Amino acid sequence: MIYFHQVNKYYGDFHVLKDINLTIHQGEVVVIIGPSGSGKSTLVRCINRLETISSGELIVDNVKVNDKHIDINQLRRNIGMVFQHFNLYPHMTVLQNITLAPMKVLRIPEKEAKETAMYYLEKVGIPDKANAYPSELSGGQQQRVAIARGLAMKPKIMLFDEPTSALDPETIGEVLDVMKQLAKEGMTMVVVTHEMGFAREVADRIVFMDQGRILEEAPPEEFFSNPKEERAKVFLSRILNH
């Protein structure tokens, strides 16, 4: 489904991703963790070509992402992305935010787009907010709208780039609950997060990155109880003892 082979990424002279080899299968939940500046977000953003790779090969859903001739919009239709900041249009209602892309990009009729939007608002637990504006919602509610918006395009893959890091502690749980439910339903998910409880409970595999490299890959029970890499041990001791 997602295949990185010897992927490198530079910003000028700065080597952000170093020889990345990673395969993510359909229906798998992969959580990427590591210290700030380790390249986690860049890696995820390469999947839908928000960032371009400098060398190597990246194949997503049988499409060579680094091929200049591909229809990038076609690729992105199959990939939902949820960022740290919700990026909702402030002048549109929740419903309008969710129906915009399906109507414009997929040419779905308005009635059907609204029904789909309501279905996903129900799924994320806020159907009563359909006619509210983003400014009337809490951060957690806005992030759940952003997830519903991503799902309304019926993607094959969902990418989450630190989806809870801008939220108040009391609203983090409601967003993680939605993500847990998605994982249970078999959505292919790539998640960058500092929420170790979520990673332990939901991930099929943990990918630990540091300084642009993947240092360790393991199932969560193995990674959290017995990490092999010294750098991973230090990271976990710092993050789990706070």
UniProtKB/Swiss-Prot annotation:
Transit peptide recorded as keyword: no
Any Pfam family the entry gives: ABC_tran
UniProt membrane topology term: Peripheral membrane protein
Induction statement: By lack of glutamine.
Major localisation: membrane
ABC transporter domain boundaries: 2-236
UniProt-annotated binding residues for ATP: 34-41
Localization per Swiss-Prot or TrEMBL: Cell membrane
SUPFAM superfamilies xrefs: P-loop containing nucleoside triphosphate hydrolases (SSF52540)
One function term, GO molecular function aspect: ATP binding
Protein family according to the UniProt entry: Belongs to the ABC transporter superfamily.
Cited PANTHER family: AMINO ACID IMPORT ATP-BINDING PROTEIN (PTHR43166), PHOSPHONATES IMPORT ATP-BINDING PROTEIN PHNC (PTHR43166:SF4)
Protein's name in the database: Glutamine transport ATP-binding protein GlnQ
Organism: Geobacillus stearothermophilus (Bacillus stearothermophilus)
